[in-house]
Amino acid sequence: MTEQRPLTIALVAGETSGDILGAGLIRALKERVPNARFVGVAGPRMQAEGCEAWYEMEELAVMGIVEVLGRLRRLLHIRADLTKRFGELKPDVFVGIDAPDFNITLEGNLKKQGIKTIHYVSPSVWAWRQKRVFKIGRATDLVLAFLPFEKAFYDKYNVPCRFIGHTMADAMPLDPDKNGARDVLGIPHDAHCLALLPGSRGAEVEMLSADFLKTAQLLRQTYPDLEIVVPLVNAKRREQFERIKAEVAPDLAVHLLDGMGREAMVASDAALLASGTAALECMLAKCPMVVGYRMKPFTFWLAKRLVKTEYVSLPNLLAGRELVKELLQEECEPQKLAAALLPLLANGKTSHAMHDTFRELHQQIRCNADEQAAQAVLELAQ
């Protein structure tokens, strides 16, 4: 940034979640530096905020080993071209948003050319493949972390990291409108309601749906009028779930929802869900939950040896204890899942204590992440 040249920020986002983060960051930066220039790899939201797209985000948004191998030559070409063009542009800061397999190498290339680099959204190095932290430390000037335990991990290895809070915590109210969500879904205010969230990936829906449905059948024995809502991320997952339900629980009445996962969580007294971001969202929705997860035996055997954390769900990692019941692999079976959910549906002391802790954790990570990220970029640009 000079008198002749405005603040110039280069960014690369590789998927929709990164596009959302990038758009929020650009918006916050423009409020402070209205004439700033933004260039790089951007999706529609970042472009709407004024980012000049040298490549469309979809070019990087490939999933799975086969798809990546099929596009590898193109991906390597894009990274080499960005290394060259950013090197010539000399932006004040480069921000790689998530997409670590693509961005961390690019960050390292740019740092060698004297360009300041930020990696926005920490990979799960604290959980597995921890030695990646050394590569990240060499490639970046700063990591922006959503969660406090991530910063503690980087501090241990002397890698500069800033905890900025979580954008999802900023977006969700501390006190959700449960009755409002029930009105949207057509659930009576006085009904007991359970949300089933068997995951967003095909393999998760295949492995978990039958046990989740059998669990709901058991719970109906105690709560005959139990309302069951099942949000599914897209038509493919809905079709998959309907096929499994027809085989396992054809007579079980449920509300199938297209998307609307957040509304389902807010409306429900309890949720049974796969681990992942959904558990964090459920915590922020203040919905008591049980995490059930199952994978293929060899994958689980491998995961047990690679994963270095005591818990798998983000609420437990944030709390530093088993706040939420985790039933994994052989433990993920209907009798045990139902037994863990019953006290939550009763809306007693267990639920209220969990709700209070969820609210405390929400406050801890509600830090206006867009503003915090913008401040970090400007400080590094000076």
UniProtKB/Swiss-Prot annotation:
GO molecular function list: lipid-A-disaccharide synthase activity; phospholipid binding
A Gene Ontology BP annotation from the UniProt entry: lipid A biosynthetic process
Coiled coil: none
Pathway in which this enzyme or protein is active: Glycolipid biosynthesis; lipid IV(A) biosynthesis; lipid IV(A) from (3R)-3-hydroxytetradecanoyl-[acyl-carrier-protein] and UDP-N-acetyl-alpha-D-glucosamine: step 5/6
Family statement: Belongs to the LpxB family.
PANTHER family xref list: LIPID-A-DISACCHARIDE SYNTHASE, LIPID-A-DISACCHARIDE SYNTHASE, MITOCHONDRIAL-RELATED
HAMAP family: LpxB (MF_00392)
Protein name, per record: Lipid-A-disaccharide synthase
Species name: Escherichia coli O7:K1 (strain IAI39 / ExPEC)
Gene symbol of the encoding locus: lpxB
